[in-house]
Structures are given as C-alpha cells and as structure tokens.
C-alpha cells in the first residue's frame, strides 16, 4: 500500500493515472504525495472526476499539454496558483465545465500557450482573478474561451492579441462581463469574430468589432 507521507514518482502518464486510480479507490483525494516532475502529458487526466481533489503542490514544470485535464470536474477548486506552466503549449478545454472553479491564476506563465480553445467554458463561478497580466502573445485559438462564464469580469486591456486567429464566441453568455480594455486590442491576424459578445449586455462594443459587423452586414443582438 502507498504511504502518502512519502513521495511517489511516476515516470509517465500511464503510471500517473494508475496512481490516481489507486488513490481514489482508497478514498485518498489529496494527491500531493505524487511527484509529477517527470510528467509531460496531463491530457484527460481527471475527466469527469467527482471528487474534490487537491493537486496544489504538483510540479508541472515539464508539462507541455493540459488538454481536457479537468473536463467535467464540477467540484474541482484546488489552489493552482503556484503551478509553473511555462512549458505548456496546449490548454484546450482544460477546465471545461468546472462549475465550482475560481482560482487566482495571476502567477501562471502562459507565454508559450498557442491553444486556449474552450479553456474555461461553463466555469460558472470563475471570475477571472489574475488573468489581467497574462502573456497571451502566442495564443492563436481562443474560441469559446470564456463561453458561459456567467461571473467572469476581468480587465483584459493588457492582452497582446496580435497572434490570435480565432476568437469567435469567446465571451458568449458572459452576463457580468463589461469588456474593460478591449478597445486596446490590436487584432492583426484575426479571421473569426462572430458571436463574440452574444449575451454580454454590459459590453460596450469596441470599434474593431463594430467594423467586423459592418463588413459582414450583421447586427448585434
């Protein structure tokens, strides 16, 4: 039996998944006894997990993908503020439908991330604490990033959107979002904008979005 007072170091994702399953089978939800420093792939790791787990002290410094890592983890709200995300490139669907999640992510280095598709979709409790100064200068796909984040309201004026190609439905259904700072965005490569602010009644549409609507002969509802 694993002694949770000792660190256990899996060499790959398969071994890590076995350790997690073992812990859950023994009603162990504090997973900080696992040394994850050798893991590079954490995709789909906790999909539809029903437990309130603690992974706050995990070493993710070598991880390159967190694709669908916490999809459907409705109770998940572990403190991830000190995670080193410097090598992650893919955060696609990372917190999809984590309805309880509302962690301060101000310390995250996301400067190498290119894919943020649907990253926080349906995170109904997520307010966006700490995202103000994220370096998203390499992000290309931001579709549905905050889709139906009903409590999201963050000032994103400092975001470098120069590489963003797809941002359609990015803030769809963000009822409390006021759109602070969006006028400052320079969208040099963006191809897809549609339905970006649908359901965002508090947003004053930035000029670049109005220009898009005009080009497409559309109206904002």
Describe each region flagged by the PLM.
Residues 1-221:
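Negatively charged
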């Amino acid at each position: 039996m694993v002694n949770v007072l000792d660190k256990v170091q899996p060499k790959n994702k398969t071994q890590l998944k076995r350790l997690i399953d073992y812990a859950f089978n023994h009603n162990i939800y504090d997973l900080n006894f696992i040394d994850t420093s050798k893991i590079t792939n954490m995709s789909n790791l906790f999909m539809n997990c029903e437990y309130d787990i603690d992974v706050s002290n995990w070493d993710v410094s070598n991880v390159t993908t967190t694709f669908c890592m916490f999809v459907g983890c409705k109770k998940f709200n572990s403190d991830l503020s000190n995670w080193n995300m410097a090598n992650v490139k893919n955060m696609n669907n990372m917190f999809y439908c984590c309805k309880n999640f509302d962690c301060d992510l101000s310390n995250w280095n996301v400067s190498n991330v290119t894919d943020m598709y649907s990253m926080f979709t349906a995170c109904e409790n997520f307010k966006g604490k700490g995202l103000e100064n994220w370096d998203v200068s390499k992000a290309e796909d931001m579709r549905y990033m905050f889709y139906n984040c009903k409590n999201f309201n963050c000032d994103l004026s400092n975001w470098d959107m120069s590489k963003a190609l797809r941002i359609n439905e990015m803030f769809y259904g963000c009822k409390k979002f006021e759109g602070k700072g969006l006028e400052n965005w320079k969208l040099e490569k963006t191809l897809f904008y549609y339905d970006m602010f649908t359901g965002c009644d508090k947003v004053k549409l930035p000029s670049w979005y109005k220009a898009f609507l005009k080009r497409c002969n559309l109206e904002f509802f």
